[in-house]
A protein has these predicted regions:
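Extended alpha-helical, oligomerization-prone segments that build pores/tubes and scaffolds
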Residues: 1-340
Length: 340
């Protein structure tokens, strides 16, 4: 897609990527609507009286068959040569992986991925680099050779990485978008949706972006009335929608918001350089799908494979229960028995 507006290339590029998101929504619109219906059925929302929720029963049966416990890292040398150093390195890597998945709730991430794959049909997780920074001054032992330290160094405002880790993070199936592709290798971009408060936007993207964004109230609690909150409190909880775009073709990562007519880059990464140097660029593997298709990446929910049988079972179960409710209790006895 070419940029036509040469007078304002930033706005033109923003329009291009907003159009990419719209096309991604359109491609999977029918599947998203179907996924919402399946999730509601699983939760029992709108369930008819005397019906039988076979979807919930089947899902709870299949979940432990797909994933039941934390995986155990197994690192081995590719070639079993007489290489003590290689064996030691493999053992160290295996222990590091074991410790890494114990430091956060990796089990929850896997469980949610499997649940999304069983219901709407797509489970997504991503990796995130999480460094812990510490403020330091001029390094010790270099006072004589080093030049006069800057004001920030004298004040102890120079930051160094004190500890770092990589964690897996579950992505809700409705918060993920992708570029066109029949197979995963053809996908050139991915998008992850975030909702950020104004203070978070200011810290991450600066004052200009924070003031240019429109913020809306989240609708998590449908039963809460607006009168419970005054205007001051309401402003504190308003959020704005952002899309984190990983552009594989352009080799960059940036953010999009409908109201800010330009690509948005974090203040600590104004060039959009990818924070992770991954071989396949994206921060996630191919999404988990239980029904594979070599001609399309649009998921097929497992429930669609036995939907007709499930509906038939529900009709039969409903009729049986209605018949039972309509029965009147009667008794019979042998008239030849005078005692009765």
């Amino acid at each position: 897609m070419e940029l036509k507006d040469k007078a304002n290339p930033a706005a033109a590029e923003h329009r291009r990527w907003m159009r990419e998101l719209q096309l991604a929504d359109k491609r999977e619109k029918d599947w998203r609507e179907l996924g919402k219906k399946i999730v509601k059925t699983y939760k029992g929302e709108g369930r008819k009286k005397n019906s039988f929720n076979i979807l919930a029963a089947n899902t709870e049966t299949l979940r432990p068959a797909i994933y039941s416990s934390l995986p155990k890292p197994d690192v081995r040398r590719r070639f079993r040569d007489n290489d003590p150093l290689g064996k030691a390195v493999a053992e160290v890597m295996e222990r590091c992986l074991s410790v890494a998945i114990d430091h956060y709730d990796f089990d929850e991430c896997c469980r949610y991925d499997c649940l999304d794959a069983l219901l709407p049909g797509r489970g997504v997780s991503r990796v995130r680099y999480v460094p812990s920074l510490a403020e330091v001054g001029t390094p010790e032992g270099h006072e004589e050779d080093a030049e006069e330290p800057s004001h920030e160094a004298q004040e102890g405002e120079v930051e160094e990485v004190e500890y770092e880790q990589v964690v897996c993070e579950h992505v809700d199936w409705e918060d993920f978008r992708r570029g066109y592709g029949r197979v995963w290798a053809e996908v050139q971009w991915e998008g992850f949706r975030h909702r950020l408060k104004k203070a978070d936007v200011r810290k991450r993207f600066g004052d200009e972006v924070a003031e240019d964004i429109k913020y809306d109230e989240e609708k998590d609690d449908q039963n809460s009335s607006k009168s419970q909150w005054d205007d001051t409190n309401s402003e504190l909880f308003k959020t704005a929608e952002f899309w984190e775009i990983w552009d594989k073709e352009g080799g960059r990562v940036f953010f999009l918001n409908e109201h800010h007519k330009a690509l948005i880059f974090p203040v600590d990464n104004p060039t959009g350089e990818p924070p992770l140097k991954l071989e396949r660029f994206f921060p996630n593997a191919e999404p988990l799908r239980l029904v594979e298709d070599s001609s399309s990446l649009i998921p097929t929910p497992v429930f669609e494979l036995y939907k007709d049988q499930a509906e038939e079972l529900e009709r039969i179960s409903t009729r049986i229960n209605k018949i039972i409710d309509a029965l009147k209790v009667r008794g019979v006895y042998d008239s030849t028995l005078k005692e009765l």
